[in-house]
């Protein structure tokens, strides 16, 4: 056994000598490695067995060998190694050696060679490489671990057990005392990192091992005791009794060194096995742990820096992203500059992203080296880096030993070192090792591991809860409590805070004034004052800022506001506020909803109120406007009707009726008309108008009873359109009882009349109507200027609607005493008559139609307008109209008149006179009825009124009176009309033909003339009656004269004025009124209205007596006036038979008319136009002034009647003489008649009668 150990020692020595010779010239660092290699040649030669043997022997022999080694050699080599080790540390330091070697093992063994070898090392690595495979694993650790000198322990390892028993204590004492100093010295240097201990064995092996081997081989026991003997005399002999065991007493000073040496020897081959470390002491492990910790600290620092860089880069990335969102915000496309900014932003983001990727990779590598446990020590780094992995932490904590083994055998983690050290302590049982630094490190490592595990477990949950990327959004639930505004978005809310509405609120908040530190300069009591300018103003920048009350932070713009609201500071502050006030959000939300609901209700209420107010205001305006339009305007059809109705109601009632009643009465009239006429609504307006026109145009006046009859349900609808419904209402109010009595008879008569009327209308009449329309339209401009109304509209209304309206107004005026049905029938008949007469007049005086048609049309339109305008002052109009027409047309009306027209006129005059004693009020109603025949008359009326009888005009009160005459004429004219009812149909047709050609009067015989004037005369008769009735009773006398005069003057004046005014107006009105309605009305109305018919017949036929009786009986009424006038006319004509006289009168008129066109139609037309213009001007100017004076007293004064009677009689006689002289055109000189007519018109104008009213009366 001893020999074997000796041989081993000798071999070791040789290896050591050879190595020493080679290493001495080289650098010490290389020598150490060579020494390591010398320590390992055995292992290399013996292979892995040698390594195992060295491990076995290291425990016992290592210690004795380290002591037996010559102190001088070890000291010298330690000293040399000291100076030379730093470079080896530099290259073999843990930075390069340990981890590089580990990396080299991982990374194909390149890095360690590069790092280890300057060129010298590279040269000598030839042997070292060949010798040491093991050093490659732990070779870099060898310099630190060589203090245990692995070569020395193996040789002693074998013989050590042999030497202890063989050689006793002597050898041990000798070498033990000698060897002790190097051990102490080596231990001193071993305390710093293991540099010195490894060097000692490297250099001490060659000298000492031979001695040790020789002595060890001879003296086994001494080496064991040698550990106890020291050069310094430290308890050398105390350890001797423990020859086979390591003395514990000496371990207090020496054991640390031994442990380091043994561990260093094991760490040289630390790869060999952990049990080697377990058997070794803890001191070498302390050095390893310290170095590992240092390296880890450095790596931790590096990783912390990288983590900080990552956090900064991420912040920059967020800023860039926010900026890009702001740049890209908005619907409008970005501008070129904005695009450039966006591109630059994208480029920067890409760069930062690349940097982040690289840095994160480096951090991953460091985590793999250091372990993720270290990350837990830096939670801030974890959060910033975002790579907290609790699972990995747990796995690391549990598998710390595995990770350390994987990283490197030498660079095992502190936990592994602590575990191994604890095992070694347990195995060795060294009590003194508890207070060693290794123990302390071990305990620290264990505690840190346990604490880390606990912290990892504790932090696992909160870290998981924080693993979210917060994305903020706008809840769009904003509310400015002070202003009561609900902005839609956060941006709108921030803008609202700067709006005037918010800035001008009553309460203003200034939280920034609280706790603000202005940092003013201190003030000293006795110090002098020094003036200093305020500087730095140029650095102030304006900003629409906001102040966060929670955070006490100023925010300069929207970008900063967005950043602040999304910041952790603001979120934390708000969370703290919520923690203090947990119900704040709920309360705020409920208050917001409540305020929103209140605001909505308030807004709705305001809107409703405003709408209601607007509606009310609009309704009031409409009502007022409607009332005003009804009273003043006549543009709209409805407004015209309403105004006519209102006017008719006020006029039909006492003249003192108020305007309010006018506004309401039309409605009442309409409502009353509805029950009266049940089928009115059912019938269409068009059919009603057509039927009414046909009935009016038809000579079927045999049934004039219908107008007198109350409302007939089937016809009334037609009448309603043709005749004004307001009239019905008035009639109903005045004569509802009569309507109820005669309603059945009226229905039958109305139906019969309509049936007869429709076929009566001929195509020639229709043509004439169309011609009249065209002429009126063409010549309407003049009339518009004079009457301020469109002639075309007047014509259209006349034929379509106007006739009905005017007739309605007339019938209203008449309706007071009449039944509704009577007014309707009369209106219809008046329309037909007026149209036919206008046509005939125009046809007769085609040569003069230029003057007639325009004048008539203008007068008609004027009369219509004047009627509506003058409805209030109807008394004046009525007086004026009958006067004018009475004087002109009385002779013709007496000879022949349509029954229907006469009856209508009679009834109208009677009803109006009854309803309103003042003839002026009743006249307006009469205006509309006689207007049909009067239109042409009034056109001529300007001149003819003067020509015929100025006195008659005056007596009648006004030229306007002729239109109203229909009501007064109704009685008288009806009587006259009764006479000539039979011939009216044929005669009317003849008259239409004659009028169309204009030559009818001269060519036709008396009968023919009678026929012509039957249609033409009914209006004159009505006018004559009205003229007489409308003025006071005196007008009839003058009316007769006017009548006598009328035919002559009418013819002449018509000739002068182209006979449009006088002959057509006189002839048509009078003839239509006298012949037709008298017969039919008297016959048919005997049952219904016997009084009216009888009175009319008596007044007409008996001449003066009947007229006087009628005038006396009806002096209060207008009918008396009309009757007296007609009677006077009849009396004047009674010298000859009434019929003959009428016929002759008609002949005279027709002859005059015929002669005039033959002589000079153009001249007469021109003269008439001139006279009409003059008359119109004079009328317009004078009528207003003289209306009250002359019109009112004239109709109302009965004493004037006799004067008029005388005048009318004289005029009638003159007219009779003139009638005989009619064939001679010179009988009525145009000039004298014109002068007369002009004077009459002037007087009428003075009375306040407008030519327009006259024209309207005649037109309709």
From Swiss-Prot:
Disordered as annotated region, ranges: 1-168, 376-441, 594-929, 1023-1063, 1189-1239
GO cellular component terms attached to this protein's record: nucleoplasm
GO terms classed as biological process: negative regulation of DNA-templated transcription; positive regulation of DNA-templated transcription
Biased composition (Pro residues): 148-158
The organism of origin for this protein: Drosophila melanogaster (Fruit fly)
Compositionally skewed regions (Basic residues) per UniProt: 48-60, 117-130, 137-147, 618-641, 801-816, 838-873
Biased composition (Basic and acidic residues): 11-23, 102-116, 594-617, 738-750, 763-773, 822-837, 874-913, 1042-1061
Coiled-coil region list: 285-366
Bias (Low complexity): 400-421
Presence of the UniProt keyword Phosphoprotein in the record: yes
Zinc finger (Matrin-type): 546-576
Full protein name: Zinc finger matrin-type protein CG9776
Modified residues (Phosphothreonine): 338, 700
């Amino acid at each position: 056994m001893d020999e074997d150990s000796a041989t081993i020692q000798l071999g070791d020595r040789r290896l050591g000598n050879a190595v020493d010779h080679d290493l001495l010239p080289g650098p010490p660092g290389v020598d150490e490695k060579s020494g390591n290699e010398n320590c390992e040649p055995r292992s290399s030669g013996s292979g892995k067995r040698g390594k195992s043997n060295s491990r076995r022997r290291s425990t016992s022999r290592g210690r004795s060998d380290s002591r037996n080694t010559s102190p001088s050699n070890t000291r010298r080599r330690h000293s040399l190694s000291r100076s030379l080790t730093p470079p080896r540390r530099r290259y073999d330091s843990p930075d390069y050696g340990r981890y590089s070697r580990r990396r080299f093992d991982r990374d194909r063994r390149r890095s360690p060679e590069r790092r280890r070898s300057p060129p010298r090392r590279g040269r000598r690595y030839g042997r070292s490489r060949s010798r040491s495979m093991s050093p490659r694993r732990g070779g870099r650790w060898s310099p630190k671990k060589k203090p245990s000198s692995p070569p020395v322990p193996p040789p002693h390892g074998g013989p050590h057990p042999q030497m202890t028993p063989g050689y006793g204590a002597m050898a041990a004492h000798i070498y033990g005392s000698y060897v002790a100093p190097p051990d102490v010295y080596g231990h001193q240097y071993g305390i710093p990192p293991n540099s010195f201990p490894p060097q000692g064995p490297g250099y001490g092996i060659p000298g000492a091992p031979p001695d040790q081997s020789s002595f060890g081989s001879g003296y086994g026991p001494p080496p064991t005791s040698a550990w106890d003997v020291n050069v310094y005399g430290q308890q050398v002999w105390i350890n001797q009794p423990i020859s086979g065991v390591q003395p514990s007493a000496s371990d207090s000073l020496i054991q640390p060194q031994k442990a380091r040496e043994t561990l260093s020897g094991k760490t040289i081959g630390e790869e060999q096995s952990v049990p080697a470390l377990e058997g070794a002491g803890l001191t070498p492990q302390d050095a390893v742990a310290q170095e590992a910790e240092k390296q880890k600290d450095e790596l931790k620092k590096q990783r912390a820096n990288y983590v900080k860089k990552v956090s900064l880069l991420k912040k920059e990335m967020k800023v860039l992203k926010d900026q890009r969102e702001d740049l890209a915000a908005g619907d409008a496309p970005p501008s070129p500059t904005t695009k450039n900014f966006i591109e630059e932003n994208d480029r920067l983001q890409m760069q930062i992203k690349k940097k982040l990727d690289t840095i994160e990779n480096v951090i991953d590598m460091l985590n793999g080296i250091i372990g993720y446990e270290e990350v837990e020590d830096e939670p801030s780094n974890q959060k910033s880096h975002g790579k907290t992995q609790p699972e990995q932490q747990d796995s690391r904590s549990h598998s710390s030993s595995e990770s350390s083994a994987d990283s490197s055998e030498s660079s095992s983690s502190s936990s592994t070192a602590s575990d191994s050290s604890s095992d070694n302590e347990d195995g060795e049982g060294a009590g003194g090792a508890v207070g060693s630094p290794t123990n302390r490190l071990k305990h620290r490592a264990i505690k840190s591991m346990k604490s880390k595990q606990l912290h990892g477990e504790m932090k696992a949950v909160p870290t998981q809860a924080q693993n979210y990327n917060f994305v903020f959004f706008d809840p769009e639930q904003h509310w400015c409590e002070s202003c009561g505004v609900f902005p839609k978005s956060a941006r709108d809310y921030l803008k609202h805070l700067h709006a005037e509405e918010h800035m001008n609120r009553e309460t203003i908040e200034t939280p920034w004034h609280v706790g603000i530190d202005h940092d003013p300069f201190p003030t000293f009591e006795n110090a002098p004052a020094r003036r200093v300018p305020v500087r730095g103003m140029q650095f102030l920048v304006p900003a629409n800022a906001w102040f966060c009350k929670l955070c006490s932070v100023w925010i300069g713009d929207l970008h900063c506001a967005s950043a602040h609201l999304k910041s952790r500071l603001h979120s934390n502050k708000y969370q703290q506020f919520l923690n203090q006030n947990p119900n704040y959000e709920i309360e705020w939300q409920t208050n917001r909803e409540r305020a929103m609901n209140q605001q909505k209700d308030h807004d709705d209420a305001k809107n409703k109120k405003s709408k209601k107010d607007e509606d009310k205001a609009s309704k009031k305006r409409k009502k007022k406007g409607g009332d005003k339009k009804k009273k003043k305007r006549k543009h709209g059809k409805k407004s015209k009707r309403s105004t006519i109705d209102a006017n008719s109601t006020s006029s039909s009632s006492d003249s003192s009726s108020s305007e309010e009643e006018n506004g309401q009465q039309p409605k009442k009239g309409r409502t009353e008309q509805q029950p009266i006429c049940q089928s009115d609504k059912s019938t269409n307006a068009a059919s009603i108008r057509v039927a009414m026109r046909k009935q009016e145009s038809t000579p079927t006046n045999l049934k004039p009873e219908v107008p007198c009859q109350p409302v007939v349900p089937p016809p009334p609808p037609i009448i309603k359109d043709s005749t004004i419904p307001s009239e019905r209402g008035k009639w109903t109010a005045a004569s509802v009882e009569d309507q109820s009595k005669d309603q059945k008879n009226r229905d039958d008569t109305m139906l019969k009349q309509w049936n007869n009327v429709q076929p009566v209308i001929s195509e020639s009449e229709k043509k004439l109507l169309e011609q009249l329309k065209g002429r009126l339209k063409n010549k309407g401009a003049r009339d518009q200027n004079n009457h301020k109304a469109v002639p075309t509209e007047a014509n259209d209304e006349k034929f379509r609607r106007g006739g009905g309206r005017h007739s309605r107004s007339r019938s209203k005026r008449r309706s007071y005493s009449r039944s509704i049905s009577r007014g309707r029938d009369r209106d219809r008949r008046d329309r037909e008559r007026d149209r036919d007469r206008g046509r005939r007049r125009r046809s007769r005086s085609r040569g003069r139609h230029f003057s007639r048609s325009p004048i008539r049309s203008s007068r008609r339109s004027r009369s219509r307008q004047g009627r509506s305008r003058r409805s209030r002052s109807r008394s004046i109009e009525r007086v004026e109209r009958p006067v004018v027409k009475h004087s002109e047309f009385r002779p013709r009306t007496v000879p022949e008149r349509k029954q229907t027209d006469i009856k209508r006129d009679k009834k109208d005059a009677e009803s109006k006179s009854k309803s309103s004693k003042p003839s002026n009020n009743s006249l307006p109603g009469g205006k509309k009825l006689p207007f049909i025949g009067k239109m042409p008359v009034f056109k001529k009326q300007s001149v003819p009124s003067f020509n015929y009888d100025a006195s008659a005009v005056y007596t009648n009160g006004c030229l306007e009176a002729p239109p109203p005459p229909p009501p007064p004429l109704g009685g008288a004219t009806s009587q006259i009309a009764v006479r000539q009812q039979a011939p009216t149909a044929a005669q009317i047709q003849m008259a239409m033909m004659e009028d169309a050609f204009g030559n009818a009067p001269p060519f036709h015989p008396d009968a023919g003339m009678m026929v012509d004037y039957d249609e033409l005369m009914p209006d004159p008769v009505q006018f004559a009656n009205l003229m007489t009735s409308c003025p006071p009773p005196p007008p009839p006398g003058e009316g007769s004269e006017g009548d006598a005069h009328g035919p002559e003057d009418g013819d002449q004046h018509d000739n002068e004025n182209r006979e449009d005014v006088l002959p057509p107006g006189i002839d048509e009105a009078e003839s239509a009124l006298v012949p037709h309605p008298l017969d039919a009305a008297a016959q048919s109305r005997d049952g219904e209205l016997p009084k009216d018919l009888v009175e009319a017949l008596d007044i007409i036929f008996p001449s003066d007596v009947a007229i006087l009786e009628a005038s006396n009986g009806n002096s209060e009424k207008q009918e008396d006036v009309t009757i007296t006038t007609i009677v006077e006319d009849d009396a004047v004509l009674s010298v000859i038979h009434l019929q003959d006289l009428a016929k002759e009168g008609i002949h005279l008129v027709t002859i005059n008319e015929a002669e005039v066109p033959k002589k000079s139609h153009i001249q007469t037309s021109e003269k008439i136009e001139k006279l009409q213009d003059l008359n119109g001007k004079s009328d317009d100017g004078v009528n207003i002034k003289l209306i009250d004076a002359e019109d009112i007293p004239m109709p109302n004064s009965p004493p004037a009647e006799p004067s008029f009677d005388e005048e009318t009689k004289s005029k009638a006689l003159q007219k009779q003489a003139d009638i005989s002289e009619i064939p001679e055109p010179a009988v009525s000189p145009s000039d004298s008649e014109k002068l007369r007519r002009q004077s009459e018109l002037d007087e009428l104008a003075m009375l306040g009668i407008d030519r327009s009213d006259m024209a309207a009366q005649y037109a309709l």
